[in-house]
């Protein structure tokens, strides 16, 4: 009888323990933001301090706030108000988020030797890759020269040494476009919110810009595909890497472009010439501590082209993966830092 009672107690205790141990779930959230889509996945083992519904609401609020500050398409955004302001050399107060993103863009302008320039917007718009409508014909040299005179990181002054950051412009026509880095910042903001909610394993993606931490439900680093450029427009995978505790972003010329008289014009503009880039680099993927940094670097390094991008990457210990177009198809190259990271992270 004692053995029977002991057995019943043991079974009851086992059932009680099983009930206490909550099953780990994969929470998937998605939506639209910044003219594209976002996807968030995180593991919830019962330790997350908010419901998935509440988390989704907070993510939506974060992304709405980023858009309200940095969109060039919203006429009432903080960025648009600065662009519409025609006063020169007159500092205006800007939000801490705006200042943070702009400060990183200015830093990356130096790293990329001028290739990432957030003041290139007037020229981008002239080519039809911004809020302005696409022109029926290629801009004339005179049109380009006029707008090129408005471009240059030296045309803006950011002051973060006071309690409130300020920004001023040297010319009335100066126009700042943060689309090359704002999505990455949005990713980082969402990631920080997940960490505040005690999420230790997550993946955040906005329009291809990514940040991941921890492991997926299979206990492996988050598996992220690098897209392979194709001549048909179909999606294909070039490589898959395990991403853990870092950001990732890619830039390429195989999706957004237009053709005129048989000539292909990519959407990335070289701020030094005012013309769409002309080289054989089809895409570049960058790994960095934050998605914002990866986002900005991928744009700037892509503008530089395959040889210069790899040179800058090696010089600055940047993790980059390049897909290069040749007469016989595509070839790949990667920096020393990329090889080291993927060898240890996969």
Curated annotation (Swiss-Prot):
Where does the chain cross the membrane?
none
Q: Which Pfam families match?
A: ApbE
Function, please? Flavin transferase that catalyzes the transfer of the FMN moiety of FAD and its covalent binding to the hydroxyl group of a threonine residue in a target flavoprotein such as NqrB and NqrC, two subunits of the NQR complex.
Membrane topology per record: Lipid-anchor
The entry's localization annotation reads: Cell inner membrane
Provide the E.C. number(s) assigned to this enzyme. Answer: 2.7.1.180
**Full protein name:** FAD:protein FMN transferase
Residues where Mg(2+) binds: 180, 295, 299
Question: What is a single cellular component term in the Gene Ontology annotation?
Answer: plasma membrane
N-palmitoyl cysteine lipid modification positions: 20
Q: Its family?
A: Belongs to the ApbE family.
Q: Which residues bind FAD?
A: 34, 73, 115-117, 177, 183, 269
The record's listing under InterPro entries reads: ApbE, ApbE-like_sf
Query: Gene3D superfamilies of this UniProt entry?
Result: ApbE-like domains (3.10.520.10)
User: Catalytic activity annotated for this protein?
Assistant: L-threonyl-[protein] + FAD = FMN-L-threonyl-[protein] + AMP + H(+)
Q: Tell me the cofactors it needs.
A: Mg(2+)
Which molecular function terms from Gene Ontology are attached? metal ion binding; transferase activity
Q: Which SUPFAM superfamilies match?
A: ApbE-like
């Amino acid at each position: 009888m004692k053995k029977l009672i002991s057995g019943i107690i043991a079974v009851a205790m086992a059932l009680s323990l099983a009930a206490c141990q909550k099953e780990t779930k994969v929470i998937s959230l998605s939506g639209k933001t910044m003219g594209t889509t976002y996807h968030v996945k995180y593991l919830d083992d019962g330790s997350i301090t908010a419901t998935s519904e509440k988390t989704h609401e907070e993510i939506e609020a974060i992304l709405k706030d980023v858009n309200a500050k940095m969109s060039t398409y919203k006429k009432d955004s903080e960025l648009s108000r600065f662009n519409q302001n025609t006063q020169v050399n007159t500092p205006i107060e800007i939000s801490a988020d705006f200042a943070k993103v702009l400060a990183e863009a200015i830093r990356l302008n130096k790293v990329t030797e001028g290739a990432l320039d957030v003041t290139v917007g007037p020229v981008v718009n002239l080519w039809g890759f911004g809020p302005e409508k696409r022109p029926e014909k290629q801009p004339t040299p005179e049109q380009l020269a006029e707008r090129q005179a408005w471009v240059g990181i030296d045309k803006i002054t950011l002051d973060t040494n006071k309690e409130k950051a300020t920004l001023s412009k040297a010319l009335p026509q100066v126009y700042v476009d943060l689309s090359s880095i704002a999505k990455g910042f949005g990713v980082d903001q969402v990631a920080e919110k997940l960490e505040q909610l005690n999420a230790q394993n997550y993946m955040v993606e906005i329009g291809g810009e990514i940040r991941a931490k921890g492991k997926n439900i299979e206990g492996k680093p988050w598996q992220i595909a690098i897209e392979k450029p194709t001549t048909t427009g179909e999606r294909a995978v070039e490589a898959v890497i395990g991403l853990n505790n870092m950001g990732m972003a890619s830039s390429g010329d195989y999706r957004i472009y237009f053709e005129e008289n048989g000539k292909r014009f990519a959407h990335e503009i070289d701020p030094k010439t005012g013309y769409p880039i002309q080289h054989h680099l089809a895409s570049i993927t960058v790994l960095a501590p934050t998605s914002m940094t990866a986002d900005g670097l991928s744009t700037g390094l892509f503008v530089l082209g395959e040889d210069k991008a790899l040179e800058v990457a090696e010089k600055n210990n940047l993790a980059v993966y390049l897909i290069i177009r040749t007469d016989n198809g595509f070839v790949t190259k990667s920096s020393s830092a990329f090889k080291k990271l993927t060898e240890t992270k996969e």
